[in-house]
UniProtKB/Swiss-Prot annotation:
It comes from Solanum tuberosum (Potato). GO terms for biological process: proteolysis. It comes from the Eukaryota. This is Mitochondrial-processing peptidase subunit alpha. It is an enzyme of class 7 (translocase). Belongs to the peptidase M16 family. Heterodimer of alpha and beta subunits, forming the mitochondrial processing protease (MPP) in which subunit alpha is involved in substrate recognition and binding and subunit beta is the catalytic subunit.
């Protein structure tokens, strides 16, 4: 039996060898080194029919190797005759993000239009003079797009994200929704009901309440306007108010159409016919910030007490050195919660983690925050603590702010780590095409141009411990703004806390 099997294998080996010789007899590319195959596995023999990997194949053209360095795409900007800016940055990404940015937010609201920006955010991509809301939804779905709208104190933002094949449709849709809103009465009423629900929801969110409270208490005038409509103002909002607000503020010189992932010439050909007929009118002067400081307290039956201490950032983004220093300072101080749902390790070496959260189990959350605008801003610390520890937690916040006003208190290793973390955050965020588009739009509205990212990275590298101390000294010399929610009666008085900074 075994002899028969052996003879059959010998016959197979002979036939296979003949086939190999016939196939490659005319080729000079026969492998000189044997390699295994199916019959090698069966018989233990070797085959010499495989071409070596270093042998060039005939009629195969290799693509040129990628360069070691590719220069980043530059932002190209064109200003139309009516003052509207069109800006774009090309990329190899198959998708594009386009945004229409308007220099208009809650600081432009008047007593007659309080809450308009909140309602406008809800009314985005609703019916226009040319399309019903259903048609808008269907057209967005048809190309797999994603649209968003957001309102801030200084800007209204409308964005569209989809494959770059559909850039003409994206630009046309954005232009129609922003330029030609119908503000149908029934749609406005429907969204007002949703705004009321949001107001009720946010009233139960202490962190949101504190952020709005430090603005309303800290500023007199437009910068104190709430981003949220209130029960008192919502009943005055209607389609007429929205139409008048848009007509006054949505003007060509105050608009930027920005895109990431689009070739500029093609983008301009699509955008110019759709936006060049917007009226060119004189730009309204931006409201001046009036910072006064103040105290807001909301007594509530809650397990935790929430508080925030804040000071003005004079100059805002227009004071570049100070704003970059504050960005590093926020990363340096850091903070977070005593429990991290995303897992441990995030920000564990920041000052507020090491010196506060790791030392005081009664404190559940403690972090630095900032809200920076064109010409002003706020910087401070917010915390959440058990109610019986409220006074001590406020005292800890005071000590931490005073500590960084002394350059000897800022460890160089910590500062270097904060600068690297700040640069990493900027670069990683800019990898998102939506963030890149927003960065273009916001910079053009603020500076009139887009500074390259290297410009800001150099500014961050230049920050020193003395710069940190100098900025903090300016901060805490301005009037204190204090906001609290929960068992506020046990917290120290505004004057008591404010005097701590004056007597430092």
């Amino acid at each position: 039996m075994y002899r028969c099997a052996s003879s059959r294998l010998s016959s197979l080996k002979a036939r296979q060898g003949n086939r190999v010789l016939t196939r490659f007899s005319s080729s000079a590319a026969v492998a000189t080194k044997p390699s295994g195959g199916l019959f090698s596995w069966i018989t233990g023999d070797t085959s010499s029919s495989v071409t070596p990997l270093d042998f060039p194949l005939n009629d195969v053209k290799l693509s040129p190797p990628l360069p070691d360095y590719v220069e980043p795409a530059k932002t190209q900007i064109t200003t139309l005759a009516n003052g509207l800016k069109v800006a774009s940055e090309a990329s190899v990404n198959p998708a594009a993000s386009i945004g229409l940015y308007v220099d208009c937010g809650s600081i432009y609201e008047t007593p007659a239009s309080y809450g308009a920006t909140h309602l406008l955010e809800r009314m985005a991509f609703k019916s226009t003079l040319n399309r019903s809301h259903l048609r808008i939804v269907r057209e967005i779905e048809a190309i797999g797009g994603n649209v968003t709208a957001s309102a801030s104190r200084e800007h209204m933002i409308y964005t569209y994200d989809a494959l770059k094949t559909y850039v003409p449709q994206m630009v046309e849709m954005l232009a129609d929704c922003v330029r030609n809103p119908a503000f149908l009465d029934w749609e406005v009423k429907e969204q007002l009901e949703k705004v009321k629900a949001e107001i009720s929801e946010y009233s139960k969110n202490p962190q949101h309440l504190l952020l709005e409270a430090v603005h309303s208490a800290g500023y007199a005038g437009p910068y104190g306007n709430s981003l949220m409509a209130t029960e008192a103002t919502i009943n005055r909002l209607n389609s007429t108010v929205l139409e008048e607000f848009v007509a006054e503020n949505y003007t060509a010189p105050r608009m930027v159409l920005a895109a990431s992932g689009v070739e500029h010439e093609e983008f301009l050909k699509v955008a110019e016919p759709l936006l060049s007929d917007l009226p060119k009118v004189a730009t309204i002067e931006e409201p001046k910030p009036v910072y006064v400081g103040g105290d807001y307290r909301c007594q509530a039956d809650a397990e935790m007490t929430h508080f925030a201490l804040a000071f003005e950032v004079p100059g805002g983004w227009m004071s570049e050195k100070e704003s970059m220093t504050l960005t590093v300072l926020q990363m340096l101080m850091g903070g977070g919660g005593s429990f991290s749902a995303g897992g441990p390790g995030k920000g564990m070496y920041s000052r507020l983690y090491l010196r506060v959260l790791n030392q005081y189990p009664q404190i559940h959350a403690f972090s630095a925050f900032s809200s920076i605008y064109n010409n002003t801003g706020l910087f401070g610390i917010q915390g959440t603590t058990s109610s019986d520890f409220g006074p001590q937690a406020v005292d800890v916040a005071v000590k931490e702010l005073i500590a960084v006003a002394n350059p000897s208190e800022v460890d160089q290793v910590q500062l270097n780590r904060a600068k690297q973390a700040t640069k990493s955050a900027i670069l990683m965020n800019l990898e998102s095409r939506m963030v890149a588009s927003e960065d273009i739009g916001r910079q053009l509205l603020t500076y009139g141009e887009r500074n390259p990212v290297e410009h800001f990275l150099k500014a961050i590298d230049a920050v020193s411990a003395k710069d940190i101390a100098s900025v903090v000294q300016k901060l805490i010399s301005s009037p204190l703004t204090m906001a609290s929610y929960g068992d506020v009666l046990s917290l120290p008085s505004y004057d008591a806390v404010s005097s701590r900074f004056r007597s430092k």
